[in-house]
């Protein structure tokens, strides 16, 4: 999981064991892409799978034969699926599938992920509050 950059372009040190919840996963592929998978490297667990949508017209945003959209995976409170938890330093695997019936160059697949630090459970802190009078 990319640890990103800190403020003012410098590097900020992060705890690789910090627990995060995934919020969004946006996949990116080029023409002839047929699907992307995001998997937890240590277990092979499938975290997100998506398939590109191809245009079938001539209008802008619906160009025939071109990838015009790839739906993201989105997690959160109900009715959304619960967010997968990952460690900041955890390795992820991208599987990017392409139709190879024709020659293509520049094929690739990447994910853009957003995540949020896991907040301590409110249940874990229940009864530990102090009231000052």
Where are these regions (language model features)?
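Beta-strand-centric surfaces of beta-sandwich/beta-rich domains
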Residues: 1-133
């Amino acid at each position: 999981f990319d640890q990103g950059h800190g403020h003012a372009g410098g590097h900020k040190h992060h705890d690789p064991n910090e627990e995060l919840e995934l919020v969004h996963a946006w996949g990116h592929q080029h023409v002839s892409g047929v699907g992307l998978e995001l998997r937890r490297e240590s277990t092979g667990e499938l975290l997100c799978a998506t398939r590109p949508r191809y245009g079938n017209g001539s209008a802008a945003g619906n160009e025939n034969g071109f990838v015009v959209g790839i739906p993201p995976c989105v997690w959160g409170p109900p009715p959304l699926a619960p967010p997968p938890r990952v460690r900041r330093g955890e390795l992820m695997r991208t599987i990017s599938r392409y139709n190879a019936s024709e020659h293509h160059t520049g094929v690739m697949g990447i994910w853009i992920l957003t995540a949020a630090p896991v907040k301590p459970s409110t249940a874990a802190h229940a009864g530990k509050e102090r009231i000052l009078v």
